Regions:
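Rossmann-like NAD(P)-binding element
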Residues: 61, 70-128, 136-151
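Structural motif
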Residues: 32-34, 55-57, 78, 91-95, ...
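Rossmann-fold dinucleotide-binding core
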Residues: 120-212
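Active-site-proximal catalytic alpha-helix in oxidoreductases
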Residues: 177-232, 238-256
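NAD(P)-dependent Rossmann-like dehydrogenase/reductase catalytic/cofactor-binding core
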Residues: 2-6, 11-17, 232-349
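Gly/Ser/Thr-rich loops at beta-strand to alpha-helix junctions
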Residues: 38-43, 62-63, 100, 119, ...
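Small-residue helix-packing motif on alpha-helices
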Residues: 66, 86, 102, 237-241
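NAD(P)+-binding Rossmann beta1-loop-alpha1 motif at the extreme N-terminus of oxidoreductases
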Residues: 2-77
Length: 349
């Protein structure tokens, strides 16, 4: 464990220096890791674990996702099974189905949770809102979590590049006395950059807040608002998109991601610098009440209720596609499609 200062607050983190890959292999040497679900997080975690030398199998229903698993080298009947077979064979059952899928499959999964097995999550949703999901693990199994702070695709890409994606970790239930060791070993196995401790409740709450806030919901709302204002005042789609999205994603985002917002402010034009310093507090004051409202909606379980209710509707997928199609057809993103085609790396040489 390493002590690190995060903005004046000391936290304990774990990296491969404190918990080596060799130690992780030793901790999990007698385990059969069953990755249940090969959708979003499943491929990255399963392939990283396999490449790091762990005993991994995959459980997936037939369909396109099953075919993807085959294409990734998982062999039917050897390392690729039905969900039921994988759950029976596995000693660590990794619940990497969607939140809705976890609720649906729980009656099946719990049949195979024999004493001493481990139930693994990468999101606290099902456990934290168990009153709504019905997911209540038996007392004689370990319940652990490693939650990558990014997509499964990013986890795999960074692993293949020799880098790691930061992860939070938590132990909800330690029936064997070895739950924390298994958790840290699993984090190293999937290719964590560094790991920081949390709880299922804090992970679920912060994750839903982030997705609805600055990571997805708020950023779409902010970008669209600026784009619309520019267009309504006579700016072309190309100009509006470049000043709203392209410069952010291709130039500024990588800069403040690598060096910090303060560095970016210190290394831009004086005009941009002055304007940003003056307007940032106004946006903060306008947005913070909405963020507080959002956090309350998450914390009280309202967002979980909305998610579960929506996913339980038989026509949800059709309705979702209509919503995504509406976003896809927004002028801003149609303009963006053309802008992306014009990037040098997308030009025919």
């Amino acid at each position: 464990m390493a002590q690190m200062n995060f903005g004046g607050v000391t936290e304990t983190v774990v990296t491969s220096k404190e918990f080596s890959l060799e130690k992780a292999r030793e901790v999990l040497k007698n385990e059969t890791i069953a990755v249940i679900g090969y959708g979003v997080q499943g491929p990255g975690q399963a392939c990283n674990l396999r490449d790091n030398g762990f005993n991994v199998i995959v459980g997936q229903r037939p369909g396109k996702t099953y075919d993807k698993a085959v294409a990734d080298g998982w062999v039917p009947g050897e390392t690729l099974f039905s969900i039921e077979e994988a759950a029976e064979k596995g000693t660590i059952l990794c619940m990497l189905l969607s939140d809705a899928g976890q609720i649906q499959q729980w009656p099946t999964i719990k049949q195979y949770l024999k004493p001493g097995k481990t139930l693994y999550y990468s999101h606290g949703f099902a456990i934290n809102w168990s009153d709504r999901t019905g997911v209540i693990p038996p007392k004689d199994v370990d319940v652990i979590m490693v939650a990558p702070k990014g997509s499964g695709t990013s986890l795999r890409t960074m692993f293949c590049e020799g880098r790691g994606l930061n992860c939070s970790y938590a132990v909800y239930q330690d029936a064997t006395g070895n739950a924390k060791e298994k958790t840290l070993a699993f984090g190293i196995g999937i290719g964590a950059g560094y790991m920081f401790e949390t709880t299922f409740e804090r992970e679920a709450t912060s994750d839903l807040t982030g997705e609805r806030g600055s990571l997805m919901g708020a950023i779409q709302g902010l970008l669209l608002a600026q784009y619309e204002v520019l267009r309504e005042h006579g700016h072309s789609p190309s100009e509006a998109f470049n000043e709203t999205v392209e410069e952010l994603t291709q130039s500024l985002g990588p800069l403040f991601g690598a060096k910090g917002m303060d560095w970016m402010y210190a290394n831009c034009s004086t005009t941009a610098q002055r304007g940003a310093l003056d307007w940032a507090p106004r946006f903060h004051d306008a947005i913070k009440p909405v963020m507080e409202w959002l956090y309350y909606s998450v914390q009280t379980g309202n967002e979980a209720r909305i998610t579960i209710d929506a996913n339980s509707k038989p026509d949800y997928r059709a309705g979702l596609e209509k919503e995504l199609e509406a976003m896809r057809n927004q002028e801003m993103w149609r303009a963006g499609e053309t802008v992306r085609k014009l990037r040098p790396e997308n030009q025919d040489v």
